[in-house]
Amino acid sequence: MAAIGVHLGCTSACVAVYKDGRADVVANDAGDRVTPAVVAYSEREQVVGLAAKQSRIRNISSTVVKVKQILGRSTADPQAQKYISESKCLVIEKNGKLQYEIDTGEETKLVSPEDVARLIFSKMKETAHSVLGSDANDVVVTVPFDFGEKQKSALGEAAGAAGFNVLRLIHEPSAALLAYGIGQDCPTGKSNVLVFKLGGTSLSLSIMEVNSGMYRVLSTNTSDNIGGVHFTDSLAQYLASEFQRLFKHDVRGSARAMMKLMNSAEVAKHSLSTLGSANCFVDSLYEGQDFDCNVSRARFELLCSPLFNKCIEAVRALLQQSGFTADDINKVVLCGGSSRIPRLQQLIKDLFPAGDLLNSIPPDEVIPIGAAIEAGILVGKESTSGDDSVLIECSARDILVKGVDESGANRFTVLFPSGTPLPARRQHTLQAPGSISSVCLELYESEGKNSVKEETKFAQVVLQDLDKKENGLRDILAVLTMKRDGSLQVTCTDQETGKCEAITVEVAS
């Protein structure tokens, strides 16, 4: 039985299938192995992918991009606030949830981020079915390591709404290691691996320990000010300055003109990963004036030098944070399309002269291939080269319970610190006045910061209809079990009466 792996990134999506003992990326109907994560709306239809991206110049206010940045977030989230301020589509809050207000010309419609993601997942399913047939719907979906529970849930629900049977959510760094079979090549040895993911909008770094085939995240960091789009923008700004030099007009104040330059710069950026120069041609950039400019790889590297330095400094900072030196890293796995840039690869090689730089798999295909391998494992492919023991076995964030101290102030107790090896079980006793008939256990998540905000609450268990006591306290025993797949099972039991309630929260391993 075949299985599917899907990676939905901020700027692109990719699907791989596991069949006959191997995982391969599937090209879409345009022949591209990576699909732009862009959805364009009109009064008659929704268009996903390259056609939507190409039409954005004409329909910018009805074309949704970077939906992953807002998925599962609230207006109180700083990331959502930044997205809303930059979005060319109007984003509003309705009934406590974020919605896109899309003007198609004929009507105005409200569209949820989850529905946008559903359409992209549907495109991935259609692409996978082109080689597997319509019966194959088992999928593993990747998520960033720093995604919160609400974001993970929204991503999984969007995949389910597209008709996928979601077997598991898997963290992107773990999928990258699975793609290269790290841990299987030396199942009894111990090594440290840096996963370097330069995606469309951010740089995500993870240092992972591989020990006897088991993975553990030691340290991770994400920089939202370094991504592929920033490299593209550096080149687009240069093209704008060249146009101004030649034609005495600054087009940087025109959103339409800059979008044309960004599209041309993106194509050139991709070409410069393999060629020494690239031509940037824009038809009718300003008042009917065409623009033609040749850019060398050396020029591009000079323009992007500050960004290269930021990438390397981010790696150095993570090493210092983890207490490692460059010599402690045995392998570096490259992920994300912009990690193809030759100059960046050379800088990484220079930083880790003793480590192996793994880039034999196209960097923008590594993560979905790893997800497909994991899906193959889960559906029981007897010919798989993998083993269930190589899954990431740690919690991504601190999991806390909320209580009240003697002064009445909120008190948070960390039960599963970030990086806790899985599976794991914790017990927590909650004391409540005997005079009340219901008790609520609230679960929160955090990134290890000193305070926990209300929006980080992700689940609760309520014990109701308890017999009241005139005096004293009642003890409620909470047993929390986080399984290998990252799901969290919570059972609360009144110790006096035995009354209990239980929930299961699906999270990513």
From Swiss-Prot:
GO molecular function, one term: ATP hydrolysis activity
GO cellular component, as recorded: cytoplasm; cytosol; nucleus; plasma membrane; ribosome
Record keyword rRNA processing present: no
Keywords of the record: ATP-binding, Chaperone, Cytoplasm, Nucleotide-binding
InterPro entries named among the record's database cross-references: ATPase_NBD, Heat_shock_70_CS, HSP70_peptide-bd_sf, Hsp_70_fam, HSPA14_NBD
Subcellular location, principal: cytoplasm
Keyword RNA-binding among UniProt keywords: no
CDD domains per the UniProt record, alphabetical: ASKHA_NBD_HSP70_HSPA14 (cd10238)
Subcellular location: Cytoplasm, Cytosol
A Pfam family annotated for this UniProt entry: HSP70
Matching Gene3D superfamilies: 3.30.30.30, 3.30.420.40, Actin, Chain A, domain 4, Substrate Binding Domain Of DNAk, Chain A, domain 1
Protein role: Component of the ribosome-associated complex (RAC), a complex involved in folding or maintaining nascent polypeptides in a folding-competent state. In the RAC complex, binds to the nascent polypeptide chain, while DNAJC2 stimulates its ATPase activity.
PANTHER family, sorted: HEAT SHOCK PROTEIN 70KDA (PTHR19375)
Protein name from the UniProt record: Heat shock 70 kDa protein 14
Highest classification ranks of the organism: Eukaryota, Metazoa, Chordata, Craniata, Vertebrata
Gene: Hspa14
